[in-house]
Amino acid sequence: MWKEGLLFRVLIFAFAALLGEGVIDYDSSLDLPSSHVPVTTPCNLLRSIVKWDSLYFLEVAHNGYMYEKIHAFFPLYPMLIRFFGEIIALSGLETECSYILAGVLISWISFAAASEMMFRLSKILFSETRAELSTYLFIINPAGIFMSALYTTSLFSFLSITGLYFFYKDMSLENKGKSVITVPLRNWIAGTV
């Protein structure tokens, strides 16, 4: 199911890029002092999904928590953006562009992994047919643009669904004595990440 999830992310991104070029939108978030969205670079294609909270995640990835209003944004996602953005920047891509690309890749890979974990979780709870249906509905849900953008939604979906997967998998293995192995991992994933 991860392939379907990744394919749909690409389609959503293409749709957003087309709309971003043809539709004038109201976006007051670009008034931030440093938006880190280059205007004349290959990142123009990615600009269609760098809106609203994405700017704050990029700001935290670049400069850390400089302003009080930025403290509302959980640090895991910006830390991953910074880590992978610096690796991508080694290829010669501008830092801003590499951070945007890193954020997109993190979101897309997290969503693909969340789709796979949704399928596995649903197989434990339901039949395989219902597992496929629920996963396809998860993949094509109307909030798909948030799963494709530089938001924590995909990463947190992956972590939450993975935690639930281990919880229910542990319940099915409990009689076999294997819960001792999965309980600490399940609790860590579901409760502390």
Per-region residue spans from a language model:
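Intrinsically disordered, low-complexity domain-flanking/linker segments in eukaryotic proteins
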Residues: 28-38, 89-96, 171-185
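Transmembrane alpha-helices of multi-pass, membrane-embedded glycan-processing enzymes
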Residues: 77, 81-88, 103-117, 156-159
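Transmembrane-helix signature of polytopic, membrane-embedded enzymes
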Residues: 93-102, 113, 118-140
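Specific aromatic-rich, kink-prone transmembrane helix
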Residues: 117-120, 137-140, 155-190
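Short acidic/glycine- and proline-prone juxtamembrane loop motifs at membrane-interface regions
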Residues: 143, 148-155
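Short hydrophobic/aromatic helix or loop-helix immediately within or flanking a transmembrane segment
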Residues: 48-93
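Start-transfer (signal-anchor) and selected internal transmembrane alpha helices
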Residues: 1-38
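Residue-level signature of the transmembrane alpha-helical core
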Residues: 2-6, 10, 79, 104-109, ...
